[in-house]
Amino acid sequence: MQCTYKHCLYQTRDIPDYDDVVKNKRHYHKRCLETAETIQAIVDLYYNEVSKTVVMKTLLATINNIVFVKQIDAKYLLFALKMAIQKGTVIKAPYSLQYIIDDYAIKNEWQRRNAAKLGREARENSVADESALQAPKFKRSTGKPEGFDAIFGGQ
């Protein structure tokens, strides 16, 4: 099967069986579908919360430039837009998204939340194996002299 996403994230559009996701009779890579859905969420959020009179072509061109040309994660863009709306940042045009993603406070909050999320996942995934927690046992051979006798070669 071939990925039908216009901006496929892989060099070859071929989809291995384990990575194939079907939506509306179209085949996608898991990451491609996730990116497409995130971009749609960004468009919906912008339209509903920022401006209903936005020119969609301009909005999509700006989002595609950020995600595919600048290689900014679509999830980060969605997070940044939500944070900007929550803080009351004035967004007059889709081009403002370029500046929102560079906001120092938003970047720090994103890193803090990702670090907390990774820490939470690590705690959930770590299984306390009692045998791994026990100290290793060492055996000592008494065939050779110990202490200063071993250093000086004496018996």
Regions found by a protein language model. Name each.
Residues 18-72, 140-155:
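Long, charged low-complexity interaction segments
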Residues 7-15, 36:
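Cys/His-rich microdomains that often coordinate metals
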Residues 3-8, 29-32:
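Short cysteine-rich clusters marking metal-coordination/redox-active sites
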Residues 1-5, 62-82, 123-125:
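Compositionally biased, low-hydrophobicity segments enriched in charged and small polar residues
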Residues 75-136:
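Short, cationic/aromatic linear interface patches
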